[in-house]
Amino acid sequence: MSWSAKQYVAFEEERTRPVRDLLGALPPIDARSVIDIGCGPGNSTEELAARYPRARAIGIDSSQDMIEAARARLPNIHFKVQDLNTWNDPGPFDVILANAVLQWVPNHEVLLPAFAAKLSPRGALAVQMPDNLGEPAHRMMREVAAAGPWASKLEHASKARTPLPKPEWYYAQLKPVCSKIDIWRTTYFHSLPGGPGAVVEWFKGSGLRPFLEPLSGEERSAYLERYTAEIAKVCLPLADGGVLLPFPRVFLAAIR
């Protein structure tokens, strides 16, 4: 699946706020080695480096486009294209940040203990994942996909992500390898100017990618037209013409 840094950063402030909230929950350790997994265009890496200014920061992402944007943004930080499934750097890292990436990756029962094993003693694992598959905006992606002439092409798109396990499950995975675990869930109400169309633009940078990529240009336009019409039914304009986008997110902050 390809990614567009330009599309993603169209709502950079809203996408970056959860990173700040997550990093703010970590202890003020004297970190010397930190890594941003799934760093995207570098907005989260910038926050990580600011939180731990004495540390050597690294950013990895599977998207060449994202890495190029991150390098342009932060030329003094080392970024590389790296598939998370084949990432084998043993560390140790004082902080591992995984912001809005693990929702795309299966086998959390394997990944999370493996990440914790890469931490230095008292190192921190910081994870943030969208938990919004049940929200109308995501439900409509699947409904429009199933109801259109593109249904066979998009059969697998609805399976690109699966619902997140419950907090108790994550606690059970981390408890054997971590001394302290904080888990919380927050719903942000992002204020987006531009009406329902802004919601569509938001998800074109994230959740819609698996649905749009398999389609031809003509099919893509038709899909987006139908999806926008459905979004307009539930994301009603506010008095100023904007909309509020409810966006639930799950946070994990664990200390080895």
Predicted features, each with a name:
Residues 109, 116, 122-194:
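Conserved catalytic/acceptor-binding region of the Class I
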Residues 41-43, 161-256:
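Conserved Class I S-adenosyl-L-methionine
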Residues 33-89, 110:
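Class I SAM-dependent methyltransferase SAM/SAH-binding core
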Residues 95-109, 131:
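A short SAM/SAH-binding and catalytic strip from SAM-dependent methyltransferases
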Residues 1-13:
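Class I SAM-dependent methyltransferase Rossmann-like catalytic core
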Residues 27, 53, 71, 75, ...:
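Short conserved AdoMet
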Residues 88-96:
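A short acidic, Gly/Pro-enriched loop at the edge of an enzyme's catalytic core
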